[in-house]
Amino acid sequence: MKFSPALQSATLILRYKRFLADVVTPAGEHLTLHCPNTGAMTGCATPGDTVWYSTSENLKRKYAHTWEITETQQGAFICVNTQRANQLVKEAIATHTIPELTGYGSIKGEVKYGEEGSRIDFMLQADDRPECYIEVKSVTLADRDNGYFPDAVTLRGQKHLRELMSVAATGKRAVLLFAVLHSAIERFSPARHIDPKYAQLLNEAQKQGVEILAYKAELSADNMTLKSTLPVVL
């Protein structure tokens, strides 16, 4: 996924009200960016970090600029725009980058399913195999080279795990794919210290046939590509 037009850089002053961030450009201009991330963004929003942002041509938008990537003062790249995770996964499926998800002729997004009124991120279909339901989660929380999800208690994430277990029980494929969007992360685990219920459900889901994958993106200010699988440590 190549950013076009190219992203612009600025220095982070402050993220606030979850959806807003104040930055200053190299030319000294102060801007307010839209922050497309509802999470805690721990370690992703330290004042002084470099922010890479895109600019919309939609004149109706209140905030024309969107925070896409953080380049930390330690040199790590982190994609904070959670919408990019699904785009990366869709691209990776289409280019056969994820071996576990090859062999399907049809890919559909945002399909209604489950008993709790959910929408699955992707559903893959083929004539010769069961349907494959894929839920995507974005991973940006890091402690050294360990990556964790979630970065805050997530009742929605717990619901998705229950829905995936129900899918697996019918004989269809249920896949939970963690898109790791932090360049320093080398392995993935559930954030038991933040949301123990989610960690418990993730273990239960694996035992009940839900496939758990973690794939890491190669990140820069120019482009992003889902590249390599990472070990999952439950």
From Swiss-Prot:
Gene3D superfamilies: 2.40.50.580, 3.40.1350.60. Pfam families: SfsA, SfsA_N. CDD domains: SfsA-like_bacterial. GO terms for molecular function: DNA binding. It comes from the Bacteria. Belongs to the SfsA family. This is Sugar fermentation stimulation protein homolog. It comes from Enterobacter sp. (strain 638).
